[in-house]
Amino acid sequence: MSVFKVERVDYLNEKDAQALVFLLDAYAQDPMGGGEALNPEASARLCQDLSRIAGAASFIAWSEGQPIGLINCFEGYSTFKAKPLLNVHDIAVLAQHRGQGVGQALLKAAEDHARQRGCCKLTLEVLSGNAPAMASYKRFGFAQYELDPAAGQAQFMQKWL
C-alpha cells in the first residue's frame, strides 16, 4: 500500500496545474475516460479557466512527490433542498495505485469540502460498465438517485453543443 497525502489544488500554481493536467490526460486516455488524449488547446488553458469558475474545487493525491490521483468538483444547487450541492465531475487514480484507498481519500476530501460549504449532498455520474468505480462509490455511501422507486432511477444524459 502506498503512502499518500491529498491536497487542494491551487489552479494558478504551476506544479499543481501540471499535475492536474497530467492526471486528467491519463484519465482521458483510459477506456473509462474515452480513450483519447486531451486536446492540447484545452490542456493549455484548463487550469486558468478553472481558476475563474466560482465553486470549482480539485484535490490531488500525492505519493513521494508524484501525483497519483485527482478529483474535480463543481458546486451546484439543489432547488428541492434550497442548498448548494457538490458534483464530482472527474475522479481518477493512476492504474498502478488503484485498490489502495486513493479514490476513497479523494472522495473524503470532496465530502469534507462540501460539508464546509454547507452542501446538502454529493453527486456524480459513472459509466455502467465501470464496476470497480461503482463498487468504490457504493462503499463510500453513494446510491442510485431516485425520488420515488415507482418512477425509476435518474438517467444522466447529454447533448453536445
Residue ranges of model-derived segments:
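Conserved acetyl-CoA-binding loop-helix of GNAT-fold acetyltransferases
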Residues: V93, G99-D112, A135, R139
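Conserved amphipathic alpha-helical interaction elements at protein-protein interfaces in regulatory
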Residues: A26, D30, T79, G99, ...
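Acetyl-CoA-dependent GNAT
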Residues: V3-K83, H89, K108, L147-A150, ...
